[in-house]
Amino acid sequence: NINGHRKQAVEWLRALGIPVLRWPGGCFADDYHWRDGIGPVQKRPRRVNIHWGNYTEDNSFGTHEFIELCRLIGAEPYIAGNVGSGTPQEMRDWVEYCNYPSGSSLADERAANGSPEPFRVRYWGVGNENWGCGGNMTPEEYAAHYRRFSTYLRDFGDTRLFLIACGPGGNNLEWTRRFMEAMPRRTRIHGYAMHYYSRGRDHARRFTVESLRAQLATFWDLEKAILEQRALLDKYDKDRRIGLLVDEWGVWDRIDPEEEKRYGRLFQHITMRSALAAALGLNVFHRQADKLVMCNLAQTVNVLHALLLTDGPRCIRTTTYYAFELMKPHRGATAVRVQAPEAPPPALSVSASRRQDEIIVTLVNPRHDAGLDVECALSRGTAGNARARILHHPDFNAANTFETPDLIVPRDHPVSASGSSLRVELPPLAIVTVQARLSGV
């Protein structure tokens, strides 16, 4: 380990190039009091996590540990503050503790706890799911809380805060409309975060074909939700001062009661289907990159649509991890508009981007019963030196396990480039990323 952080997990997460990491929740955020997680670990109080099984939270992972993890993996921290059971004073003090350079009592306390330099946390969520576990508020009630809390959240030193309001669960346009109508234009709000989960009908390892199709089709609904939420925000925010986020998204599947007792309520098996869902979601975000400022998978380790699973000393990369790995070449590139044949979902999903003289295309075939011979035609220029990687397994219930951790991993895949076209064959249940040299543009 590295100061208590599992070394293997740190190395694998750093390799993905994760840009932003969100913490401490989730529903837990609105019952979390930050002072519980600072100071000597052995003196930190133990609290009951009332949302997820009433287990004891020992607070050994607090603010300093979170910031250290972010630095180790190269991610910017995003902290979700407590609006549901907290106070404006508590959140205001947390910002000062993290960001004030030196000379105040809170900055001196941070230094005494081992961090003389400010953490420079830019991203702050003002509550989480306040329509539900974050306080069961109406849009108007939450808007009043947001106005009050945000009044006291200030920039310190050279850190300019990016304040994020709680948006709807799913495509709830009524929540957005009523919240925006209750917000005066002078209110400091930089981001608006919706959540989107695709709930599984079956146990994660026992999906039927019908359940597979139903779950994967929900990612076409995700794209519709992004378009409609952004369009509604634009009515109140014509200059797009407020960025749209999807700061919780992913699949949420069922497990057996005995598995819940062993691993916890939010554990789930990560299968080939999970990887397809992740890739479909990422393709949506790529296609709608001009309408989004941030998206955060739920979650990272051992919970829901996880990248990594651990069991004692063992740690494995899930198929979700490898879906993200295949998408990594798009990071830092510019989105390219794509047109694909229309078909009832789930169907072929495509996103593309360009980085200088390179074109990157990710294709997802979510069908279980048919392969696809795909030709990608470039509107300008020619392609050459093409290479491709594939993540594929013929069984959508197959998974990387602690016994077979490398069952499903990316492999090289044939692709051809000729003139202005790329050609690649996709077997059923496959994710392929193609990279090619672009010339003549």
Predicted features by range, described:
Residues N1-R177, E181-G191, F219-E223, L227-I255, ...:
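Non-catalytic accessory regions flanking glycosidase/transglycosidase catalytic cores in CAZymes
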